[in-house]
Structures are given as C-alpha cells and as structure tokens.
C-alpha cells in the first residue's frame, strides 16, 4: 500500500486567503483561512497589500498541514484559484511591489476608460477581449500604476517591472522569482488578452502604454508551472500544477466542461457562467465572453453574466427592513404563504446588471395590496433572485443557441430549498446542488491533480461529483409564463422610475 497523498488548493479571495487539502476521493481533509486588510484610500478606491496577500496565503498552507498532521512530502500538487482582475506590479530585481494591489472593485480608472472610448476602442475591446471597456478589468489599472507611481514607467520600459494578477504573483513568490506565468482564464480578464488568437494584444498594450516585457507567459489551466518548497521541509519540492480564476475554477469544480453546461454561484451577487466549448460566442445581450476550461484544462470559451443583488437582497430584509433575524430564516417565512400574493421585488439597489445594464434603475416593490404581509415580501425577494437568474440564462441561451442541460448551483444561498425549487420552476430545468459546495477549491484541486496524474481523467472526477439534491420543475407552462411576464413588468417599473424623474424636471 503506497502512502496516502493529497492535493492542496490555495484559494486567494477578495477578503481572505484559504488553503483546502483534499484526499483522493475529493473529501476535504483540512481547511485554514486568514483574513487580510481592505484598504480604501478614497471613495471608490480599493487596494490590498500584495505582501500581506502572500503572507496570509503561505501561512494558511502551513496551518492546514499542521492541523491535519499531513507532511509536505505527502502533497502530490498545489492548485491555485484567485480573485480575478486584481492587479499587481512589482520590481523583478527586488521582488517588491511598486504599489498596492489595485482590486477588481476599484473604480479609479473610470477616466482612463472614458479616454479609450473617446478614441473609438470600445468595439475593438469587445471583439478581441470579449469584455466591455470598464475599470473592473486589469488593463487600465496597470496603466494607472505606470502613470502615477514615480519612476514606474521608466523602470517598466527598462524591463525591470513585472505585471501579474494574483495567481501570477503567488507563483512568482512560491518559485522564488523563477516562474512568471498566468493561465488563460486569468489572462482573459485583463482586457489585454486577445481571446481569438490566444495571445497578448499588442494594439491594446500600445494604446495603454504597457511594455510587453511586463506580461507573464500564458499557459493552460492544468500543467506543471514550477515547483515550490513552501511549507516544505528540506528538499521537498511540490509541483504547482493548476491555475484558474475563481469563477472559472467553480465552473470546473462543478464539472461544467462541455458546451451548454452552466453554473450559478449565489453569493452577495450571482455569477453565472456557461461553457460554450470551442466556439466563441459574442453576446448581443450584454454578457461577457471569457475563457474557461475544457475537460483537460485546455482553453474553452464561456459566457458570463453577473447579477448585482443576490444574497445581498436577503441581507437587506434582515439589516434594513428588519423583518428577518437571520438570512437562513427566509426559507421558513417564504413557505408560510402559498404565493407572493402578486408582489414582485426588483432589488435594483445599485442599478441592474446583465442583461439590462441599467445604472439608473432603482429597487422597486410592486403589486402591493391590503392583504400583503411581510411573508409575501420575503417570498417575493427570494423569487426576485431566481427571476434575475432566468434573465441572464435566457440571454445565454439566445446568444449561444445552446439549450441549457441543467443548472449546477453553489454559494451560500443554495442551502435555501425554497429558492432552489423556485429556481427550477422558473427555468423549467433541473437544478443540481452538489454535496461538496467548496466548488472553487475543488476546481483548482482537480486541475492540479489531473496535471500530475493524481487523478487519471475527467471521467474519474465526474464519478466523485456527488449531488446532494436534484430539484425538478413542477410548474405548468401557463403558470410559469404568467409569473415571468409579471416580473418583466416589474423590471420595467424599476427602469421607468428615473425616466419619470427626468420628465418632472
């Protein structure tokens, strides 16, 4: 009997760094987590300290090993998944960042984006990167650092500076500066990567004044990039063998590796990704085209849509309206009534995301009558999350021409059985909830394990993807269509609110 080996996933998120150790049956053996500082230098700006990201991430690996009594020489490989778009620029000679990491949420580069739009680059960005010209993505963040940090542009042009998303920074640190790489999924979120030719886009680098020498080499999401001694005693060298951005790692962890397979992560917002296989689909409905992973970690195309308010709308019921003590109580109260009594809640608190992209829409409750109570409003709020998910999935199916096979789900809100059943009814599609909901870490671990032969094939992994529950649609077509029509009317009310204000003026 050979000694038990394990895979570790490093999950570097927006608020914390985690290490998750898995065994051969994909059971979680040990988890360690450390939060780190959120830095807000001014309104709309968000930063992290790259050295703190590194310190918290490396210490979680040591801690996860110590907690479980697993030795470093029992690790078959390390997989990395990370918050996407967050941008780090560092000096390759000193290993020191020239500025804090500029986080994906940071809006400081809005003016740079407007300038690029005025130069007619919007269509070029959409056609070649699959993205919209927005401060969310890495490209304008790199330009900002080069333009605003003293000496940065000169050093960059002299070949002294390197750029990376968080995955690149971690691999560079773990290999003592020997390896400067990223994977296709992270590269596709920079707004600097051509997803048609699968290479850095020279025109966009030139337009933003970014030297090509700063860019990491782009590799598949499943291969050995280098080896590390991190957490290792003496000469133990552990292969770093998997990299994927968090949403793409979740897509892979859910085994959505073929065209038409999709997942929804129900967090603060909702992140929907649909694998479209080897065919690049350009959205006509405000979705992003991005790169994901095929069965062997090779690049595949995907459509991505985000809903701004998912679980956050339940927090609003708890914190602001105070009609819930805990978010988990929402299921109990929603099932105290048979219907939402004609009420629709459109949680457009910060506008509407895909497929509407209406920054001026505002939250709306419509259909109120004297018989409506707090349970109806709680139920309608949960239903609103499911309707928004249908809005995005309808757009994905229209864009791709691919019928959704089923919806795989993960994230905190999937514990809510009422929401999951209603989601199935609204979509007229099966909803699959996995037993292990740590799908982001699973995805990174699977990619790493396949690269080193820890698992032999995607088929072996499919067998490990045990479902906790399958929700099947119950509604008849007439009822489903009538409800959804009502939702569309409610959304129109949310969108008309600001237009009416303009007319009053």
From Swiss-Prot:
PROSITE patterns membership = FGGY_KINASES_1 (PS00933), FGGY_KINASES_2 (PS00445)
Q: Extract the InterPro entries matched here.
A: ATPase_NBD, Carb_kinase_FGGY, Carb_kinase_FGGY_CS, FGGY_C, FGGY_N, Glycerol_kin
Task: Quote the record's activity regulation.
Answer: Inhibited by fructose 1,6-bisphosphate (FBP).
Q: Does the keyword Nucleotide-binding apply?
A: yes
- Which pathway, per its entry? Polyol metabolism; glycerol degradation via glycerol kinase pathway; sn-glycerol 3-phosphate from glycerol: step 1/1
Which positions does UniProt annotate for ATP binding?
Answer: 14-16, 268, 311, 315, 412
State the disulfide connectivity: none
Report any Pfam family annotated for this entry: FGGY_N
Residues binding ADP are 14, 18, 268, 311, 412, 416
Q: What is this enzyme's EC?
A: 2.7.1.30
Q: What keywords tag this UniProt record?
A: ATP-binding, Glycerol metabolism, Kinase, Nucleotide-binding, Transferase
**Which positions bind glycerol?**
84-85, 136, 246-247
Xref: HAMAP family:
Glycerol_kin
For this chain, the family text in UniProt reads: Belongs to the FGGY kinase family.
What's this protein's name?
Glycerol kinase
* Source organism: Vibrio parahaemolyticus serotype O3:K6 (strain RIMD 2210633)
Name the gene behind this protein: glpK
């Amino acid at each position: 009997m050979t000694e038990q080996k394990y895979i570790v996933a490093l999950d570097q998120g927006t608020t914390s760094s985690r290490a998750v150790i898995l065994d051969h049956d994909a059971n979680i053996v040990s988890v360690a987590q450390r939060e780190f500082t959120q830095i807000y230098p001014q309104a709309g700006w968000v930063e992290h300290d790259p050295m703190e990201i590194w310190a918290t991430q490396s210490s979680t690996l040591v801690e996860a090993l110590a907690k479980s009594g697993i030795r470093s020489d029992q690790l078959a490989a390390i997989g990395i998944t990370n918050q996407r778009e967050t941008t780090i620029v560092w000096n390759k000679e000193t290993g020191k960042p020239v500025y804090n990491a500029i986080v994906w949420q940071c809006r400081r580069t809005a003016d740079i984006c407007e300038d690029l739009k005025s130069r007619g680059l919007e269509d070029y960005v959409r056609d070649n990167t699959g993205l919209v010209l927005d401060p969310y993505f890495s490209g304008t963040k790199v330009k900002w650092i080069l333009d605003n940090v003293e000496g940065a542009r000169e050093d960059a042009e002299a070949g002294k500076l390197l750029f990376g998303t968080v995955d690149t920074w971690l691999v560079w640190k773990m290999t003592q500066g020997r390896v400067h790489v990223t994977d296709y999924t992270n590269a596709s979120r920079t707004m600097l990567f051509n997803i048609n030719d699968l290479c850095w886009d020279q025109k966009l680098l030139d337009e933003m004044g970014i030297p090509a020498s700063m860019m990491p080499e782009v590799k598949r999401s499943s291969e050995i990039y280098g080896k590390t001694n991190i957490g290792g005693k003496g000469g133990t060298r552990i292969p770093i063998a998997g990299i994927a951005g968090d949403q793409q790692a979740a897509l892979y962890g859910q085994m959505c590796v073929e065209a038409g397979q999709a997942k929804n992560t129900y967090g603060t917002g909702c992140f929907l990704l649909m694998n479209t296989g080897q065919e690049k689909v350009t959205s006509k409905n405000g979705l992003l085209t991005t790169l994901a992973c095929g069965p062997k970690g090779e690049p595949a195309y995907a459509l991505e849509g985000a809903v701004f308010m998912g679980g956050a709308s339940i927090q609003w019921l708890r914190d602001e309206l105070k009609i819930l003590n805990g978010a988990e109580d929402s299921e109990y109260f929603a099932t105290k009534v048979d219907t939402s009594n004609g009420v629709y809640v459109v949680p457009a608190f910060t506008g509407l995301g895909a497929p509407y992209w209406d920054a001026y829409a505002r939250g709306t409750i419509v259909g109120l009558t004297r018989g409506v109570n707090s349970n109806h409003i709680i139920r309608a709020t949960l239903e609103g999350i499911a309707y928004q998910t249908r809005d995005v999935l309808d757009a994905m199916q229209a864009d791709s021409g691919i019928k959704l096979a089923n919806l795989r789900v993960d994230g905190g809100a999937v514990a809510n059985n009422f929401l999951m059943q209603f989601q199935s009814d609204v979509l007229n599609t099966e909803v699959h909830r996995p037993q292990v909901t740590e799908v982001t870490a699973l995805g990174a671990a699977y990619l790493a394990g396949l690269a080193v032969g820890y698992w032999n094939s995607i088929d072996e992994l499919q067998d490990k993807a045990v479902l906790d529950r399958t929700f099947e649609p119950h509604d008849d077509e007439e009822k489903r269509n009538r409800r959804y029509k009502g939702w569309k009317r409610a959304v129109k009310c949310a969108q008309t609110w600001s237009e009416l204000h303009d007319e009053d003026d």
